Amino acid sequence: LILSGDHIYKMDYEVMLDFHKANKADVTIACMPVPIEEASRFGIMVTDDIGRITEFEEKPEHPSSNLASMGIYIFSWPALKEALMSLKDQNSCDFGKHVLPYCKEKGERLFAYEYNGYWKDVGTLGSYWEANMELIDIIPEFNLYEEFWKIYTKGDIIPPQYISADAVTDRCLIGEGAEIYGEIHNSVIGPNVVIGKGSVIRGSIIMRNA
């Protein structure tokens, strides 16, 4: 199982693994439909009726499909080992640009596992900001407080946030240890941040300790 580190989603990998085994796949790629105008930002694939990948192209200028790779892969060890050993002398070895096309050319069984939940690539400042703003929606699509699938993070021993009587807050996430004396609207405030009296914060992400 190979994952990207700049994506936000919730997925039960065991279900994807069962799909991989059931299809006797050498490679399974998690994928989801994206707007066709954004497809050139992703690895794009075309599949047959049973989900086997017939075409794969990394970030094509003129995409033939809108089925995009999520950067989540399950490989059988023999297929991955052969690909990496064969490509080891290259200056670079990217999964989308080199490993997956190599496996496809070798005739390996590549399958697409379609995912229908929330997924966000936060590899740019713009997408990182968008993902944080989505967390403060009235009903967020990606819910940090979902009863049966909570998100647990490192616990710091710091006091709870303090919001003064004169402060104004509206649709915000405020981290522990933060002190709020000003106005905050539609923003995410990290731990140990101090928002001084007279300050007005709108549509922003303030990182910890600021």
List where the protein language model places each region.
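Left-handed beta-helix
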Residues: P78, M85-A210
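Unchanged
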Residues: L1-L135
